[in-house]
């Protein structure tokens, strides 16, 4: 595989991941709209349980999609490291991303991103269960 093909494959994977991430953001918006409906109109216990499951499922989905984005970066970097004569640009990417094999993880590697998702979960849960 050539360097061009690796970058082309990375670009294609980002397009696909971007579509799934956009869907995840839409679903997150739907979850927050559901929280507003619960706060405005009230809800029974079973409705709150289902809203909780729906919200946590959306957070799980989004964390999974963002882990795939990280895996795309790292897989491309690993593929570049297997080239016989990588370019300077490829070397910079390998230095920045690393060249070790990785598996998807729901725990974000960036601590700020992890805190952001924790805040989203707290906002959803307090909106559903507290009034």
Label every PLM stretch briefly.
Residues 1-32:
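Cytosolic-side membrane-entry/anchor segment at the start of a transmembrane helix
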Residues 16, 90-123:
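Hydrophobic alpha-helical transmembrane segments
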Residues 18-25, 53, 57, 116-120:
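Residue-level signal for the membrane-embedded core of alpha-helical transmembrane segments
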Residues 26-36, 107-131:
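Transmembrane alpha-helical segments in integral membrane proteins
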Residues 35-46:
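Membrane-interface helix-boundary motifs at transmembrane edges
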Residues 49-77:
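Hydrophobic alpha-helical membrane-insertion segments
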Residues 67, 99-102, 130:
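Compact alpha-helical subdomains of small soluble proteins
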Residues 67-94:
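Juxtamembrane non-transmembrane "cap" segments at the membrane-aqueous interface
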